[in-house]
Amino acid sequence: MEMASAFTLNVRLDNIAIITIDVPGEKMNTLKAEFASQVRAIIKQLRENKELRGVVFVSAKPDNFIAGADINMIGNCKTAQEAEVLARQGQQLMAEIHALPVPVIAAIHGACLGGGLELALACHGRVCTDDAKTVLGLPEVQLGLLPGSGGTQRLPRLIGVSTALEMILTGKQLRAKQALKLGLVDDVVPQSILLEAAVELAKQDRPSSRPLPVRERILAGPLGRALLFKMVGKKTEHKTQGNYPATERILEVVETGLAQGTSSGYDAEARAFGELAMTPQSQALRNIFFASTEVKKDSGSDAPPAPLNSVGILGGGLMGGGIAYVTACKAGLSVRIKDINPQGINHALKYSWDQLEGKVRRRHLKASERDKQLALISGTTDYCGFAHRDLIIEAVFENLELKQQMVAEVEQNCATHTIFASNTSSLPIGDIAAHAARPEQVIGLHFFSPVEKMPLVEIIPHASTSAQTIATTVKLAKKQGKTPIVVRDKAGFYVNRILAPYINEAIRMLTEGERIEHIDAALVKFGFPVGPIQLLDEVGIDTGTKIIPVLEAAYGERFSAPANVVSSILNDDRKGRKNGRGFYLYGQKGRKSKKQVDPAIYPLIGAQGQGRLSAPQVAERCVMLMLNEAVRCLDEQVIRSVRDGDIGAVFGIGFPPFLGGPFRYIDSLGAGEVVAIMQRLATQYGSRFTPCERLVEMSKRGESFWKTTATDLQ
């Protein structure tokens, strides 16, 4: 049976051809290799039509033009040569579109990303809608790749090399007005007239490329180009720590095209695409992409979720304010905040105002839309307005009696169907639900700070939580724009449990004489966004260390922090960034560059600050403990799968994405190698490094956690 075409041709009476893109059975248009023959058949018809005046590409999907190429195509390639051929085929198809003798216009509404933008760049002109859903970008670098269908060559010539490099190196997505300002699109119009605006443009002569700004013209010349690539190369190396080969190849390919011409540039692009597709970094990043896509489809349980129309939040602090913001402004739900102090409510409301006002200032949001979103949030000092809330999120202090009291009050003041979700980071959910009249409607919903930025949430059912409560809470998390993983109700849950030994070991090395900046730099070089000491300062030393005694009580001395170190620091009124002094000293609020190590820390904790370990040795000690604990969590069914374990670590604590998560990383090293390293460290530093039983067994059997396919589990 012949596959339905994703591209259909309709020639209007005014001799403008409309090519409609609609991949059958898919929500998103993605480009597949097999579509090339469909497009070529249409191009042949267009060339044979001597009356033709112009061509418009438009999508039939309600919220995307083309979201990119189908990533599975790359996974199907076994060699760099096969992936290179894939890129050359894409380049050739784009060249054939560009070579049409009449004006070709892309009418863009919604996501126009990756191969979608490369198709739009191959057109002679572009019109897009002013809708918030419309974004344009080349995000391939986030998968360890570069644009392989001409994007590295066409974009710099259209908008200038420095602007193009910023887009390609970061995967930055532009909104419609930004795209217009940079010359990436020729016009921005309301969605209702998109097609007609594109048709009008197609009836004119081919849009002439707008002259580049003087700065971009200078930077495209030999002297300016040399200076630009040197500067951008340095900046990129500092940002990636050499862990992402794609950025280096992007610079090389763009420079080749500018210095030696487009033919050499296209050759370099296809070759680099093929080689990058085979790198372990790209494979790991693509695996994370597939895993996160799967998690987003996972409903958490077999039961259908209950309706969600309105949410209540207990506590207007930093977490409560952040949760209110994502619930109202991302999920679009009515939110009622209760705090015993009116100032708490004001703080929470201001939090959302600040976030939205920032978007208005950056012209990402209209003032009217800001006001509409803010109107969803209200506050109270009692339970007025809580009677019919579907779900209540508790974000009060980490105190068991207080949280149990909140459960009792919610059951007394809310409907019988209302779910109680606790944002605890350390207290067992079963204990919080111990005196509940409806324990099946009590669950944990653990957000990470800052709430609006951190993509992960942990959903923690206790033994009596119903399947519907799980499904409803997962549904809410997704509406809030979060990636949820369901974890077991054990001390520390998953993320904090694997993070604690990592941070403990960093502090232990500090007491042994390693310098703060050396420890942090070693883990940043390894691939974490910030080092463990800085992370503790950012979270708050008081907050971040509160969980250590809980974990120590549950799991024993392997979670013990170095004696008296934390208490010495807290007794010296050091809380981290929030009070201006922790392991680092901080300058004026908001000036992150003013951070510097406080030398007074060393005598305070009785350390010399004269290190002996290399950066890889420092990283090895911290990371191995994290890996060992992650495997224990899998063994104890704290996490449901290695997929959830990898996603939780990457999205929850910034485990290096290019390594694919703790379980992918163990597989890449081999369980045998991990066990050997841990046994060596146990001999050197103590029993906390003893590899867990499952790792030892896997080592003996030569097993791995993941099968070789992208999404199957062992």
Curated annotation (Swiss-Prot):
UniProt keyword annotation of Lipid metabolism present: yes
BP-aspect Gene Ontology terms: fatty acid beta-oxidation
InterPro entries associated with the record: 3-OHacyl-CoA_DH_CS (IPR006180), 3-OHacyl-CoA_DH_NAD-bd (IPR006176), 3HC_DH_C (IPR006108), 6-PGluconate_DH-like_C_sf (IPR008927), ClpP/crotonase-like_dom_sf (IPR029045), Enoyl-CoA_hydra/iso (IPR001753), FA_oxidation_alpha_subunit (IPR050136), FadJ (IPR012802)
Primary subcellular site in the record, as a coarse category: cytoplasm
Classification via SUPFAM superfamilies: 6-phosphogluconate dehydrogenase C-terminal domain-like, ClpP/crotonase, NAD(P)-binding Rossmann-fold domains
Enzyme Commission number: 4.2.1.17, 5.1.2.3, 1.1.1.35
Pathway given in the UniProt record: Lipid metabolism; fatty acid beta-oxidation
Cellular compartments per GO CC: cytoplasm
Spans annotated as Enoyl-CoA hydratase: 1-190
GO molecular-function term, one example from the UniProt record: enoyl-CoA hydratase activity
Reactions performed catalytically: a (3S)-3-hydroxyacyl-CoA = a (2E)-enoyl-CoA + H2O; a 4-saturated-(3S)-3-hydroxyacyl-CoA = a (3E)-enoyl-CoA + H2O; a (3S)-3-hydroxyacyl-CoA + NAD(+) = a 3-oxoacyl-CoA + NADH + H(+); (3S)-3-hydroxybutanoyl-CoA = (3R)-3-hydroxybutanoyl-CoA
Family: In the N-terminal section; belongs to the enoyl-CoA hydratase/isomerase family.
PANTHER family linked: TRIFUNCTIONAL ENZYME SUBUNIT ALPHA, TRIFUNCTIONAL ENZYME SUBUNIT ALPHA, MITOCHONDRIAL
Protein task: Catalyzes the formation of a hydroxyacyl-CoA by addition of water on enoyl-CoA. Also exhibits 3-hydroxyacyl-CoA epimerase and 3-hydroxyacyl-CoA dehydrogenase activities.
Protein name: Fatty acid oxidation complex subunit alpha
Organism of derivation: Escherichia coli (strain SMS-3-5 / SECEC)
Lineage, uppermost ranks: Bacteria, Pseudomonadati, Pseudomonadota, Gammaproteobacteria, Enterobacterales
